[in-house]
Every structure is written in structure tokens, then in C-alpha cells.
Amino acid sequence: MSRQELRAERRRQAREESAYVAKLKRRGMSRRQIAAEMRHYRSGHRRAIEEARRRAEAARQAAIARQRAIDEGLRNEVQSNIAKDEKTGEDPEVRRAAVDALGTHAGTVVVMDPKTGRVYTVVNQDWGLRRGFKPCSTIKLVTGVAGISEKVIAPVETVSDGGRYRIDLTDALAYSNNTYFQQVSGQVGFDKMMQYAHEMGLGERTGINYPNESSGRIPLFKSGFALNRMGSHGDDFEVTAIQLATLVSAISNGGKLLVPHLPRTVQENSSFKTEVRRKANIESDVWKRMLPGMIGAVNYGSGRK
């Protein structure tokens, strides 16, 4: 039991004891009889509490064991996927660094030049290209762009963080503030949120020269708090790592959605040219306003190691 649960249990026990004593008094029992009865009563309560604690701890340990088994299965899957990656044309030094950075974590790594779309490595290609995942807080990039574009986020406006303080866009991105982006998403609205998600390449293939790329998925409809949460947690989105790489690249390069490409031969390498899928129909100042918060996340915020 947690401390809070234990305090609640003690309060409940005190109420029950008080009611039980009153019941014994109504029976006309003497103080000595009541004291003896209460010792027996409390002994039973202690056994019940210990049993509840034992069961709660057993359930907690079982949950930990299940999660460890899931994590171990995912790590094994990742290592198996990495062994099957197509490495032709990849930069071996970049790949080695990416594999080392991933370590024993269950994940994928995409290394891509945000100005040219040149891909240097994709570690765990099955997850990075062919399997969409809930984007979690990375969806805040879409919410931020939508909020600025729709004038929901003013140039110098701050928003309450749900407590005593107010926070601006830069710190909201840097610290991944859920309350801020939930408010923005709710004010932007579902249709506009989907418009900007499409504009930034979600829900469609990037065109990378690997087979069986996934297009991911975008939500069908959200309203109320579900809409707010979608803009902070990415509920019902499925996004691939390569989609996220092209989205982040578009923010940094001024709105160009590039076609990622890995040159696999000497000829492809020498003739490589940047291919722009499209230019996002978003004002250039919007991208510039996003960058300080993204940099802040790494330098001092939630992305800092």
C-alpha cells in the first residue's frame, strides 16, 4: 500500500472501531468485556491489513515482471531487426555511432541531412520505416505550428501552465508542457489540426528509397478533452521515424518537405540531388518561432541528458 492508501485505511478502521464500540455498549457489555473484544477485533484487522499489503505487493511484483518480459521481448526484436537491416550505401561510422547511442533501448534511429534529405543511416529499418508509433510529445511540433499560424499563439503571449505560473511557446516546447499545448489544440480545432498535420507530411509516405514504407495514420475525429490531449500526447496518430525526421527537417529548413534518399552506389552518390516533395504552405516566420524551443529542449529542457 502507498502512504496515502495506508492513511485512508487507518481512517476507515478508526470509524469502524468507533461504530463497533458503540454497538458493544448498546449490548450492555462492561468496559473489561469491551476491551477484550476490541483486542480480538484489532487483531483481526491487523491480519486483514497485512493480507491486503501482501496481495498488493504480489500484484505490483507481477506487473513489474510482465513489463520486464515485454521490454525484453522488444529489445530482442530490435536486435533481430538491426541484424537484418540493409546497410548498402550507409555511412559505417554514422551507423556505428547510432547503434552505440541506441544501446539496449528498444527503438530506431534515423540520421538525415535536414537541408538535402540525404540519409546516412536507418538503424532498425523495420520500425523506422514500416511501423508507425504514437508520436507522444513530438506532436507538439504540429500543435505549435498550427497555433502560431492560426494566431492562437500570439508573438509574446503566455498561457497558464495549470498552476501559479504562465509560460510562453519557447519554454512550453523546451519543457514539453502538456497544459499549454492542450489549450492550443482545443482553440485551433480538429479540422485545422489535421490540415497542419497533412501539411507537415503526416499520414503519407515520404518517398524514401526503401521498400514497404508505411504511411502512418492520423485521427478520424476528436472533440473536447480528447482533442486537447491529442495536441499534447498524439493520441490516435501513428507516425514513423522517417516521417518525423522529414517533419523536423522542414521546421529547420524553412518548410521544405524533402524526399529522403540514401545513395547506394558510387554513381548514385556522385549524382545525388536534393528532391523537394513540396513546400509547406506556412509562413516562414512560423518555422523561426519554433526553433528556440526545440533547441531549448536539448540544451536545458526535457530532452537534456
Residue ranges and their predicted role:
Residues 81, 123-126:
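Short acidic, glycine/proline-rich loop/turn micro-motifs
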Residues 74, 135, 155-157:
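Extended, non-catalytic scaffold segments that flank or surround catalytic motifs
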